[in-house]
């Protein structure tokens, strides 16, 4: 009998332990607005400058596929950059033709205009590096901008970038802040010559890379933002930086401090966005990810890996991208464009060759036509969560204050209201399931819950997310189990 009692006692202890093994995480969403008028989340979507050089333009069928995917995703903010030798500048003759190769960029900008998407447009570099201070480039570039905005009516273009990452040693500016600043004012003066252009389009900058310092430059990235605010705020409509953190520094909660370094220099009344955002694994803490990256690059048929994220195929990338967005949104930034939408946009150095393609996207729409890899055209896992972060935090969302009571830093959350509706996104990057008790600032009517788990990603026939639960009503609290390494989004936006 004693033996039986001992067995029963052990079983009872095991059951109690099992029932209480999940840590309770209390999340409180208050009605306090911490970041008003969010511009939105989106992606880098460049107009397939190299496609024809690779041997295939984007077909009508592929455009239909792209539009269908984007119509579900509802990006609120697109960064669209061109290489002028593939557009208005003929390198062989040195001549300007604004109608040259206009079809694909027109199609892209028409899509954004018709759907009210904010576009940050610009040029990666001048037509040739020797032209970086040439008035001819300024004249051509601004005339082309005016052609797109005023002549063709692409009113989606709200911001204009004159150099991509001018602080970089890979840029034609090579970190020369003074030269960049002078060119910024020259571009602005030229824009003012076109009636109404500066009322429709404002300059964005400095477009520098966070956590980077070019030895040839007088300033690190923070210094660039600070000096831009001091020297050129009168002509800057939107501040932007690029961010490529490591997984470990974001998952361990270090990134808000890094983001704040740039935000604190932005003058009151102005906004700042991430013009590009992705992950790179060169830091020591991410060495295992880097080893896997290198393994995948070795012998790859169409990339050497010089500018890629070979892990964008993986489930975990669908946790890391919304996690970064949560830090951005809670950190007072106004938007984030992921790098990038589609592998079919760039090769390293924009060489026009397919031997070293930049693989960062949610798919490669030219997988079959150019690379003889039809599977590359399929949607990758991270589209699941990123599309939800775009769709359910529309332009104009007010980001709310959230508090997470937890023993560790495994659970992250962001919440926002839009026209009286609420969206709450949560991610658990830890190794244990969490019992979440969510306190809401208002009731939710006809709410939906989306779940992204490694073995549970409900989708429709097109591969788009569908909610795990629908039609429920919440008075002010909600309880759920947020499993280890998973994402959930709760919304009553229809």
Name what the model sees in each region.
Residues 279-393, 397-412:
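Aromatic/acidic polysaccharide-binding cleft in carbohydrate-active enzymes
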Residues 1-23:
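Bacterial Sec-dependent N-terminal signal peptides
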Residues 70-248:
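Substrate-binding cleft and catalytic face of glycoside hydrolase catalytic domains
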Residues 177-327, 331:
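Noncatalytic carbohydrate-binding groove/subsite architecture in carbohydrate-active enzymes
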Residues 19-64:
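Mature N-terminal, pre-catalytic/accessory segment of carbohydrate-active enzymes
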């Amino acid at each position: 009998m004693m033996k039986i009692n001992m067995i029963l006692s052990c079983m009872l202890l095991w059951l109690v332990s099992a029932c209480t093994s999940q840590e309770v995480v209390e999340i409180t969403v208050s009605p306090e607005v911490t970041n008003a008028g969010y511009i939105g989340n989106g992606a880098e979507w460049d107009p397939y400058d190299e496609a024809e050089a690779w041997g295939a333009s984007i077909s009508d069928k592929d455009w239909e596929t792209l539009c269908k995917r984007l119509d579900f995703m509802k990006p609120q903010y697109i960064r669209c950059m061109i290489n002028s030798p593939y557009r208005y500048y003929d390198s062989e003759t040195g001549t300007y033709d604004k109608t040259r190769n206009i079809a694909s960029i027109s199609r892209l900008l028409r899509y954004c205009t018709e759907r009210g998407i904010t576009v940050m447009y610009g040029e990666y570099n001048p037509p040739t590096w020797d032209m970086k201070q040439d008035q001819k480039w300024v004249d051509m570039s601004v005339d082309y901008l005016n052609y797109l905005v005023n002549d063709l009516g692409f009113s989606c273009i709200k911001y204009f970038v004159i150099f991509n990452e001018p602080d970089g040693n890979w840029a034609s500016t090579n970190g020369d802040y003074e030269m960049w600043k002078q060119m910024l004012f020259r571009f602005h003066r030229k824009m003012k010559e076109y009636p109404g252009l500066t009322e429709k389009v404002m300059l964005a900058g400095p477009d520098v890379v966070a956590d980077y310092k070019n030895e040839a430059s007088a300033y690190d990235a923070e210094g660039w933002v600070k000096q831009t605010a001091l020297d050129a705020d009168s002509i800057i409509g939107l501040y932007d930086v690029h961010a490529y953190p490591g997984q470990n520094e974001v998952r361990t909660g270090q990134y808000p401090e890094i983001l704040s370094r740039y935000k604190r220099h932005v003058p009151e009344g102005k906004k700042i966005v991430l013009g590009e955002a992705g992950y790179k694994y060169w830091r020591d803490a991410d060495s295992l990810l880097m080893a896997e990256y290198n393994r995948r690059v070795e012998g790859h048929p169409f990339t050497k890996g010089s500018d890629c994220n070979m892990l964008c195929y993986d489930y975990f990338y669908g946790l890391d991208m919304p996690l970064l967005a949560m830090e951005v949104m809670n950190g007072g930034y106004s938007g984030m464009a992921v790098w990038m939408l589609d592998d079919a946009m760039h090769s390293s150095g924009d060489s026009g060759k397919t031997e070293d393609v930049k693989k960062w996207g949610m798919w490669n729409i030219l997988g079959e036509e150019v690379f003889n890899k039809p599977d590359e055209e399929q949607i990758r896992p991270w589209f699941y969560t990123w599309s939800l972060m775009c769709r359910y935090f529309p332009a104009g969302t007010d980001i709310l204050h959230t508090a997470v009571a937890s023993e560790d830093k495994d659970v992250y959350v962001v919440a926002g209201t839009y026209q009286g509706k609420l969206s709450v996104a949560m991610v658990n990057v830890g190794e244990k399931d969490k019992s979440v008790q969510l306190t809401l600032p208002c009731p939710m009517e006809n709410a939906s819950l989306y779940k992204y788990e490694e073995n549970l990603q409900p989708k429709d026939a097109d591969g788009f997310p569908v909610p795990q639960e629908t039609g429920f009503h919440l008075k002010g609290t909600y309880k759920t189990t947020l499993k280890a390494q998973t994402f959930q989004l709760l919304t009553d936006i229809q």
